[in-house]
C-alpha cells in the first residue's frame, strides 16, 4: 500500500499520504477492504479527496452498492444554528450507530471530513469494536448484556 501506516489502540489503522496531493482514489480498494477486515477501522489522512457529494458517492460505489437514505446517497452534515434535527448541531450526541434506523446492516460505512482537526487533536467521532468489547468483558458482564434489549425511536 503506497502510504504510511500507523496502528491505533485498541483497534484500527491510520493511513497517511506519502506526499501532498496523493489522491485517495489511487489506493487499491481491494487492499483497503483487506485492511479493514483485519483492523475494523481505517482512518485516511492527508489525501486529496472529493470535490462534491457526487464525487464521493462515485468513489463509494467501488466498495459496493450504496444504501439510499431519504436524503440521498450522501448526508452533507454541516453544523447549523437552531437546526431541526440534533445531528446538525454541534452538541454531544450520545453513543449511537449511524444506521440505527435501517433494517439492514451495511458492510461498510464511509465518513468524509472536509475540515479535520490537526493530527494529535482527535476528532468528535467515537468508534467502538463490539468484538473486542465482548472478548474483554467478564462472563458476568456478557450475561448482563444478553438480558438487555432496546428499540430505536425517532
Q: Which stretches of residues belong to each language-model region?
A:
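Non-heme Fe(II) oxygenase catalytic core, chiefly the N-lobe of the double-stranded beta-helix
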Residues: 1-154
Amino acid at each position: 500500500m503506497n502510504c504510511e501506516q500507523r496502528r491505533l489502540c485498541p483497534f484500527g489503522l491510520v493511513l497517511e499520504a506519502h506526499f501532498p496531493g496523493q489522491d485517495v482514489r489511487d489506493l487499491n480498494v481491494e487492499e483497503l477492504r483487506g485492511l479493514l477486515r483485519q483492523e475494523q477501522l481505517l482512518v485516511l489522512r492527508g489525501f486529496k479527496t472529493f470535490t462534491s457529494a457526487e464525487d464521493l458517492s462515485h468513489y463509494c460505489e467501488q466498495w459496493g452498492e450504496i444504501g439510499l437514505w431519504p436524503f440521498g446517497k450522501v448526508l452533507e452534515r454541516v453544523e447549523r444554528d437552531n437546526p431541526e434535527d440534533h445531528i446538525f448541531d454541534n452538541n454531544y450526541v450520545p453513543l449511537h450507530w449511524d444506521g440505527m434506523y435501517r433494517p439492514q446492516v451495511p458492510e461498510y460505512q464511509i465518513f468524509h471530513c472536509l475540515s479535520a482537526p490537526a493530527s494529535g487533536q482527535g476528532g468528535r467521532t467515537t468508534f467502538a469494536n463490539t468484538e473486542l468489547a465482548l472478548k474483554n468483558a467478564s462472563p458476568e458482564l456478557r450475561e448482563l448484556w444478553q438480558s438487555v434489549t432496546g428499540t430505536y425511536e425517532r
